[in-house]
Amino acid sequence: MGIKGLTKLLSDYAPGCMREQKFEGYLDRKVAIDASMHIYQFMMVVGRSGEQQLTNEAGEVTSHLQGMFTRTLRMLKAGIKPVYVFDGKPPTMKGGELAKRKDKREAAESALEKAKEAGDQEEIEKLSKRTVRVSKVHSEEVMKLARFLGLPVFEAPCEAEATCAALCKAGLVYAAASEDMDTLCFSTPKLARNLMAPSSQEKPILEFDFDKLLAGLELTWDQFIDVCILCGCDYCDSIKGIGPVNALKYIKQYGNIEGLLEHLDKEKYPVPDDWPYKEARVLFKNPEVVQTDGLTLKWTAPDEEAVVAFLCGEKSFNEDRIRKQLADLKKARSQGGQNRLETFFGAATVKSSTVGKRKEPEKGKGKFGAAGGKKSKGVTKRKF
């Protein structure tokens, strides 16, 4: 789910923390990718027709493999170095959110049956996406494929996006890539969205800078977490009716949730019973993650025969097509001779542009007295 309304809040009150980048601008970037979230997305959209998912001759779902294979090769061709991180066991506090998702999925399944009886194809298309389940087998299959493609792979002890953030904070990757905005709550220095979007959509990568975010909102990390809890997160309920704008206003005014609760009109804004906001803070501040001390990341050339044996031998993909895609990758990475190889493994530069619906506030002042983030000055040197 992420954080409700956070993207718009940042666009309005800290636009300097956001910038668009071309996909090709991530040349030589090492990026930790929330693979579990993207598997779910691929199973919803790749090869889907009505309620039918992409399957092989044996009836096994292959949407996740097709999606990950295609997107991974696109990144490798562009000189991007992905690291795939998969969800481990969800934190106990997420149980309530997971139960809600289960209820919604079951309600969608019931509504889907009615839509099929009525022959409503539009409803069938919409509701079938809400019934998608990602199994342990699906994740293990993508892990296997990623390893055959020569990528570093991790199964996080808990939330994948928390480990992505930890890898970024340790300087092992340039950014964490996820569509979930709660990745910022784990204080990842950089968050990249749209990295796995299909090339046909021509979406630029939307990059968030955490330091500029805090500067733009004039908040500490602790205060930002409190704002996100009030907006609505996966770990606990929020106070209904407050919303993102008031959440920012009240935390800036009262300092933290405790200060807000002392002044809040509880008849207008009823506080959830036994509200575990303090426990939610701990999960964001001290999550279970892969240990990064002494950790090194290694990429190798794809094992073509292993990829073919798995995708074609086990999953009935078209061998000619898979070999052609792998040959195209090899060609792309060697194009231009030695100069191209040096570019892939060496340094480069990108041009940045500020993104936001509103202009940067004058003299560094935003709403509620918040200082606007500084605009980028153009060229940024690569570090990873």
UniProtKB/Swiss-Prot annotation:
A GO cellular component entry from the record: mitochondrion
Any one Pfam family match given in the protein's UniProt record, by short name: XPG_N
Region (N-domain): 1-105
Known cofactor(s): Mg(2+)
Record: residues binding DNA: 71, 159, 232, 234
SMART domains listed in its UniProt record: HhH2, XPGI, XPGN
Keyword Nucleotide-binding applies: no
Keyword field: DNA damage, DNA repair, DNA replication, Endonuclease, Exonuclease, Hydrolase, Magnesium, Metal-binding, Mitochondrion, Nuclease, Nucleus, Phosphoprotein
InterPro entries reported in the protein's UniProt record: 5-3_exonuclease_C_sf, Flap_endonuc, HhH2, PIN-like_dom_sf, XPG-I_dom, XPG/Rad2, XPG_CS, XPG_DNA_repair_N
Binding site for Mg(2+) 2: 180, 182, 234
GO MF entries: 5'-3' exonuclease activity; 5'-flap endonuclease activity; DNA binding; magnesium ion binding
Listed PANTHER family: FLAP ENDONUCLEASE 1 (PTHR11081:SF9), FLAP ENDONUCLEASE FAMILY MEMBER (PTHR11081)
Record-stated family: Belongs to the XPG/RAD2 endonuclease family. FEN1 subfamily.
Reported function: Structure-specific nuclease with 5'-flap endonuclease and 5'-3' exonuclease activities involved in DNA replication and repair. During DNA replication, cleaves the 5'-overhanging flap structure that is generated by displacement synthesis when DNA polymerase encounters the 5'-end of a downstream Okazaki fragment. It enters the flap from the 5'-end and then tracks to cleave the flap base, leaving a nick for ligation. Also involved in the long patch base excision repair (LP-BER) pathway, by cleaving within the apurinic/apyrimidinic (AP) site-terminated flap.
Record-given protein name: Flap endonuclease 1
Organism of provenance: Micromonas commoda (strain RCC299 / NOUM17 / CCMP2709)
UniProt gene name: FEN1
